[in-house]
Amino acid sequence: EPFVDIAENEKEIKITAELPGIDKKDIKINATENSIEISAEVKKEEKEEKKGYIRRERSYSKFYRSMSLPTTVDPSKATSKYDKGILEITLPKTKVEKKTSIKVE
């Protein structure tokens, strides 16, 4: 299971996940206003041929991570990048409307 860090500032939530050896085309991210899901499915096949024998090895791995977010975000404005095994997701917070007092009559 990948290591995941969640950081928060005034404007956004940043999620960093370590996904070494995974191709970015195998990563899927789904987000709602208060949660995020990161998953990947990796299938590899290695074939080695030498005189007199053939060796084939297959490997399959997958992971799924679902996390609640500490505050409400706008998933439609989320961005992500993947570089050297590190996935970074930025989720802008939704603007909280100012409270208005309502006079009871």
Task: Label each residue range with its predicted role.
Residues 1-105:
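Alpha-crystallin/small heat shock protein
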